[in-house]
Amino acid sequence: MRLRAGQKIPSLLTGLLLLVACTPAPRPDLVKLYGVTRQATDQPPVILVHGILGSRIRSRGEGDELWVGRLSKILFSDYEDLALSIDPVTLDPVTPDSEAFAITDQAAGTDFYGRIIETLESAGGYRPGVPGTPARAGERRYYVFVYDWRQDNVRSAAALDAYIDHIRGDYGDPRLKVDIVAHSMGGLLTRYYLRYGSEDVLNDNRLQPNLWGRDRVRRVILLGTPNLGSVNSVRGFIEGVKVGLGRIPTEVLATMPSVYQLFPHPKGGDWIATAEGKPLDRDVFSARIWRRFGWSVYSPEVRQRIRKRFDSESEADAYLGLLTRYFERHIERARRFVWSLTVRLEETPWQLIVLGGDCELTPRTIVVEEVDGKSMVRLRPEEIASPVPGVDYETMMLEPGDGTVTKSSLLARNSLDPTVPRHEYVFFPLDFAFFICESHDQLTGNMTFQDNLLHILLSR
C-alpha cells in the first residue's frame, strides 16, 4: 500500500522539528574572540561586587559557616544565627561574632559567580588579585570584593573605598581607575560609592554628592541591579525569605539594614494595590504603614515568636522595644538611601552600562487582599484567593524582567514604555543597556552576558 504525499509531510515536519530541537545552539568561542587582546598591557583591574546573599558568613570564634553552610543547613535551617546584634545606644548593627570571608560561588549545586570568574581567567586573561600583593607589569587582574551583605550599604561602600585604595597601592599608582562589575544589590552600593565614597549622607535630607568615583572608576557594569528597588524585597521582608525547605524569618531580616534598602523607590511606580485593582497611596518607608498592616516586627505572630526566645517577660519586652526602634531608624535611613542614588549630578565622568533579563514575568505591584480580617500580601495573580471579575491581575501585578528585578527598575524608569521619560526626580545617567533571557540568579553564568562583558571591559 502506497502512502499519499499528504500523509508523509507531517511525519517529515515532525522529524525535522525534533532534529532542530536536539541541535545545540551555537556558542561563541570566547577564548578565540578575546585571546587576541592579550598583548594589551594597560588593562585596568576589574572588581567584582556580589549581591545580597552573595558572600559566605562565618562565626569569628570557631569558624562555623553561618551562611550558606552545609546542604543540611540549606534544606532545614531557619538561619536565626544570621541575625545582627543591635547597639542599644546608636541603634546600629554590630557583628562582633561573625564576618564575611568568601564569595558564594556555588551552593547546593547552583553556580552563582564561579562561571564569570572562570571566563575572566580563561578568555579575558585576568588573574586573581589579592589586596596587598604588588601587581606585575602588564598583568591583568580581577579582584573579588567580599562584604557582609547584611550590613548597611553605606558601610559596604566605605569598605569598597578602602578596598580600591589597597588596589591602587598594589599598582603603585595613586591615580589608577578601576572597572567594576556589580550584580544585583552590589550595584546599589557601587552607585552610592560613585556619588559619595565613604561619606554617610543619610543622617539628614541634604544628600549632597561629592562625585567620589570621578578619579577612581572608569566603567561600571550593573547586572540585574534593582535600581528602583523590588517589591520582592517587601514580600520577603513580611513573610521571610524561602531557603530550602524553610525560611529566613522576618525578625532576622529586620536586623539587616541592607534589606530595607531594596524596597521600591517612591518614584518607581505603584508598588501596592487592592484586590479590586485600585492603587494604594502608601509610603513603603513609613513605619506607621507597617504597623497599620501588622507586618514584620509589628505582626502579633512574629512578636509572640520572639517572646518565646526569652526566659522572662521583661527581657522579651526590652528586646521588642529595641527591635521596634531599630526598625524605625533603618527604614528611614533606607528612604534616604534610595533617594541618595537618584539626585541629580553635575557631571558623570564614569561610563555606566546596564545588563539584565527581560524574558520572565516579574512582580511589579503587590496586592493586599483582605481575608478573614487579615491583610494578605499577594505577589502573583495565581495567589489571589477571591479574584474580582474584570480585574486584569497579570497586567497590574507583573512586568517583564528576570523574575526578581523588573526591566523598568533595572533601567530606573517608572514605566516599561521606553517612550516615557524617566521621572524628573530620578537621575540615572545610563550610557547603554543590553538584555538577555536569563533568571536573576543565573545572569552571571549566561554566555551572552559573558561575551558582552568581555567586549565592554576590553574595548578602548
Where are these regions (language model features)?
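Bacterial N-terminal signal peptides that target proteins for export
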Residues: 2-12
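Intrinsic-disorder-associated interaction segments
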Residues: 2, 109, 252, 282, ...
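Bacterial N-terminal signal peptides
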Residues: 10-21
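C-terminal subdomain of alpha/beta-hydrolase-fold enzymes, centered on the catalytic histidine
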Residues: 307-460
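N-terminal non-catalytic accessory region
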Residues: 20-181, 185-266, 270-285, 289, ...
